[in-house]
Every structure is written in structure tokens, then in C-alpha cells.
Design a protein with these regions (language model features):
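Conserved Walker-type P-loop NTP-binding/catalytic site
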Residues: 2-8, 89-169, 220-223, 227, ...
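Conserved adenine-nucleotide phosphate-binding loops and their immediately adjacent elements
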Residues: 1-31, 129-142, 286-292
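Alpha-helical sensor/transducer elements of the RecA-like P-loop NTPase core
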Residues: 89, 120, 194-260, 264, ...
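Phosphate-binding P-loop
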Residues: 33-41, 163
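Short secondary-structure boundary elements
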Residues: 9-13, 52, 240-248, 252-512
């Protein structure tokens, strides 16, 4: 459900809750998954311009993997601008999500003899590795090139041991934002074939690459391997646009609407969604502007609370927790000479900074600017977290646990992945997958079972963040960067530390 320009609830959505098109790409992924299940490691590199749906394709792939009769381990990492200088950042986050919830016995079996290298790669599991006596008594000293080689072998060994229990789908999203170490590791994993049951799925945006971009050398190295395939996501066809509009607006589009969306979007799903939202919210206003103009004009209709949240997050460069967002807002307010402008008309929606931010987040989600994700729960003694590899070697628990088929029904990952239909809703980063307006933060902020630190907020698509960030005045940008850096300064994790340096560099080069 959404709301129109005067705040009344409507029955339209911001994004489609159905997965539309992309069958050729899903077919290729399914073949790759079958190859991995049969012990034939392979890789697939997919490219598409921004907004065509690469993130959603990966989310759909994860959904379908989660429903396979034969359990697959799905490992997913995203390279983000704010952590582009952190070595192995997307690999670190992906492996921490995989390893942190595991019981001790399973963790020890997967880590094996590579505890020291994996502890450097995934600092979050280092205390547990020390408790399990998986770290050497003395740190090993080696030259830089040997440290890199050992790191590569440690990751490959981990994937091999994981593959012995179940096939692995390793997905690295937005490689154009990745650091040199991540690019080197991806090349190594794609080209080394030792019978591991692993499929590597990598995505990037070619329109983001400069002529001298180092990723071009990585892509050349990948394409030279016989086990690496490539593919490109094309714009949606007209009939697929019809399905998209039907799913969003709840009915078949008029010829005028279809013509407008088809001509303006040129098959770009994100642009089509923004055009439809603009037509509903900007009544009497031309929707002939650019994507950025549509986004900023829609944002201008929102409350001061919502606009403050959007401005803060537009420069963050990654998803943030509610606690970090509150810290950012407090830092900015402390540095501002004037308090943030309150609502000019109507009843105040909230009292106090925390309530203002909560109201702003909810409104931003409701109008399709932000999406939210729930952090994967950490392992607790006596129970395996949902969707995590259990000691017996299967994916156990909700929401990703699978119920085996009846005996005699042969398991075929490729057939199952192809045969499933779209139309499901999932937690995806490039659309508002949750019920708009029903923020998990507001639903659960008083509940013991879901701390607010477990809820992450980010833009539905990075193009939305870029449009809003570009609309900020230079002096305002510097103040927001300073507030973001100060909020990250209290976090010990290397990725927030890199984000802090990123924001310091944007406004105080000497401190960075």
C-alpha cells in the first residue's frame, strides 16, 4: 500500500511484488547450479546498466535456491561505495553472515587448518576461533604476497569443505565498487578448479566503468577462463512492462500510461517504477524530467522528518542500523546552528529526535525511498539460527529451511530453479519488499526478540541515493559527512572505520 500526495492510503505499490522476465538468465544460473551440484565448479559474470534489475535477479536467485529440494548454501556479499577501500569487504560480510551463526562443532569443521587467515578476514569470529583453539599460539609472519596467497587458499578451502556438505552458490554483487583484493580473490576462485561444488555468480554495471578502470583487467582475466560464462541483462520488453504496471497498480494499464512508461523508461524497471510513483504523487506536474528530477521532486513533498532521514542516508554509501542513524542525526543536530525545521502545517507527528527519525524512516519506506532488512540472528547455544548450516550438513530452520520431497522424486536443482514461478515477496535491496508503511523498527522497537540494532536501512536503489545527494548544497554535504564520520567513530569494526575515513575525506582531508 502507498499514499498519495494528500497522505491518503491507496492500493498501489511502489515496486512489483512479482518477479518479471529474466528467464534466459535464470536458465543459465540454473545450469550453473546443477554443474556445481555435480562437482563441476563454474562462474557466471552478469552485467547490466543501473536500474535494470541485477540486484533483484540475485534476490530471486536466492529465493529459488532456498526452495530447492537439495540444500544449497547461498553466500551473498555486496561491494558498497563507502567500503570500497576495505580489503575483501564484500567477502568479509558474506562469510561473517555464513559463519557467525554456526554451532561450534560445525564452525570448527569448516574453518579447519585455516583459522589464522580466516580470523584476519572475518574479525567478528576471531574470539570464537580462539576459544575453539583454532588459532596458532604465535601469529605467523609472512611476506605480503604469501599472506595474500594464504588468504586465497583459506577461502577456497572453506568453500571446498562447505561444498562437501552441500553445493555452494557464492554471489558477489556490484564488483565495480570492490577493492583490488576482492577482485583478485574473485579471479582466483573463478579460475581454480579442483572439483569443488561451488558456483560463483558476479555482477557489475558497465556504465560505471571508466576507460582506465582496474575492473576491466579483472573482466579480461575472467573471460579467458573456460569455466567462466558471461551474460547481459537487457531492458524489459513491452509485455513485461505491462506485467510490471499491472503488479504495481493492480490493473491493466491504459494505452496512454503504457506509452508514457515505455517511451520514458526504455525498459528500465527502476525508471518505470519512479514514473508510476511520480504520476500518482505529482498530480498536475509534468513527469518529463530526468530520473533524478523525479526523485527529488517526490522527496520535496515529504515531511521535514522524512527529508532529514533521506538527506542523512543519501551520503552514507551503505545500509545503516537504526542506532547508527540516530547517532548521525544527533551529531548533525549538535553541529547545526539552527534546529531542523518542523512541520509547517498540521499536527506534529512526533516529539523528540528519536521519534522524528522513526516517523521519517516509516514515511520514507512507505513512499519507496528506503527499504529495510533484518540482520541475520547470531548462533545461540542449543539452537541453529534460521537458514544456517546445521551440524548435520543441511540448511535447517526458518525461513530458508527446506522440506525434502517424497522419496522417489528425484532432486534436480536446475529443473527446480527453472520451474518455480515468480510472484513472491522477499527481503531485497532494490525495492520496498516489506509492506510499505509497516516498518519493522516501529513494530518491534520495544520487543526483546528484535533489537533495533538488527534492523538495517538503505535506499531501494543507489541511484535514488545519488539523486538526493547531488541535490545537497556543498556546505550542507560537508556537515552531513562530518556527522556521518562522527557517528561511525565509535564503532570498532573495520568496515565502519573505513566508512568514517570515507566521510572524513569528503570534508576534512587532513583528519582522514
Amino acid at each position: 500500500m502507498g499514499r498519495n500526495h494528500d497522505g491518503r492510503s491507496t492500493n498501489w505499490r511502489i515496486s512489483s511484488d512479482r518477479f518479471i522476465g529474466r528467464e534466459p538468465q535464470l536458465e543459465r544460473i540454473a545450469v550453473g547450479l546443477q554443474g556445481a551440484a555435480d562437482g563441476r565448479p563454474n562462474a557466471l559474470v552478469l552485467s547490466a546498466t543501473a536500474g535494470l534489475g541485477l540486484s533483484r535477479l540475485l534476490a530471486e536467485t536466492r529465493d529459488r535456491i532456498a526452495s530447492l529440494a537439495e540444500p544449497f548454501a547461498s553466500v551473498h556479499g555486496v561491494a558498497r561505495p563507502a567500503t570500497s577501500g576495505v580489503p575483501y569487504a564484500p567477502i568479509t560480510s558474506a562469510l561473517e553472515d555464513l559463519l557467525a551463526p554456526l554451532p561450534d562443532e560445525t564452525l570448527a569443521a569448516l574453518v579447519g587448518p585455516t583459522g589464522d587467515a580466516l580470523a584476519r578476514l572475518v574479525p567478528g569470529i576471531k574470539p570464537r576461533l580462539a576459544e575453539l583453539e583454532l588459532l596458532p599460539a604465535r601469529p605467523r609472519i609472512a611476506a605480503a604476497e604469501w599472506r595474500e596467497a594464504r588468504m586465497f587458499e583459506a577461502v577456497l578451502g572453506l568453500l571446498e569443505r562447505l561444498g562437501e556438505r552441500q553445493p555452494v552458490a557464492l554471489m558477489i554483487e556490484d564488483l565495480h565498487h570492490a577493492d583490488a583484493a576482492t577482485r583478485g580473490l574473485v579471479t582466483f576462485l573463478a579460475r581454480v578448479t579442483r572439483g569443488q561444488r561451488v558456483m560463483l555468480l558476479v555482477t557489475y554495471q558497465p556504465d560505471r566503468l571508466l576507460r582506465s578502470d582496474p575492473l576491466r583487467a579483472t573482466l579480461s582475466a575472467l573471460s579467458s577462463s573456460p569455466t567462466v560464462g558471461t551474460g547481459e541483462i537487457s531492458p524489459l520488453e513491452r509485455q513485461e512492462l505491462v506485467q510490471l504496471i499491472e503488479s504495481i497498480e493492480g490493473g491493466r494499464p491504459s494505452s496512454t500510461t503504457l506509452l508514457l512508461v515505455a517511451e520514458r523508461s526504455r525498459g528500465n524497471a527502476l525508471m518505470a517504477e519512479e514514473l508510476l510513483a511520480a504520476r500518482r504523487e505529482l498530480q498536475g506536474v509534468s513527469v518529463s524530467g530526468s530520473f533524478a528530477r523525479l526523485v527529488t521532486t517526490r522527496a520535496g513533498l515529504r515531511s521535514p522528518e522524512c527529508r532529514r532521514v533521506l538527506r542523512l542516508l543519501s551520503l552514507a554509501g551503505s545500509t545503516v542500523s537504526m542506532s547508527t542513524l540516530l547517532a548521525m542525526a544527533a551529531e548533525f543536530e549538535a553541529r547545526s546552528s539552527a534546529r531542523p525545521r518542523r512541520l509547517a502545517t498540521g499536527i506534529r507527528q512526533a516529539e523528540g529526535l528519536d521519534e522524528d527519525i522513526a516517523v521519517g524512516v516509516t514515511e520514507a519506506i512507505e513512499h519507496g525511498f528506503l527499504s529495510e532488512t533484518i540482520a541475520r540472528p547470531r548462533y545461540e547455544a542449543g539452537a541453529a539460527a534460521g537458514g544456517i548450516l546445521a551440524a548435520g550438513g543441511t540448511l535447517a530452520g526458518a525461513p530458508n529451511g527446506r522440506v525434502p520431497r517424497e522419496r522417489g522424486d528425484r532432486e534436480n536443482p536446475a529443473r527446480d530453479a527453472r520451474g518455480r514461478t515468480g510472484g513472491r515477496r522477499a527481503d531485497r535491496g532494490d525495492r520496498s519488499g516489506s509492506d510499505p508503511g509497516r516498518s519493522s523498527y516501529l513494530q518491534h522497537r520495544g520487543a526483546v526478540q528484535l533489537p533495533v540494532s538488527d534492523i538495517q536501512f538503505g535506499f531501494r536503489h543507489e541511484l535514488i541515493a545519488e539523486a538526493l545527494a547531488a541535490d545537497l548544497l556543498p556546505a550542507t554535504r560537508r556537515r552531513y559527512h562530518a556527522a556521518l564520520a562522527a557517528a561511525y567513530d565509535t564503532e570498532a569494526d573495520p568496515q565502519p572505520a573505513a566508512a568514517m575515513a570515507h566521510h572524513l575525506a569528503a570534508q576534512e582531508l587532513a583528519e582522514a
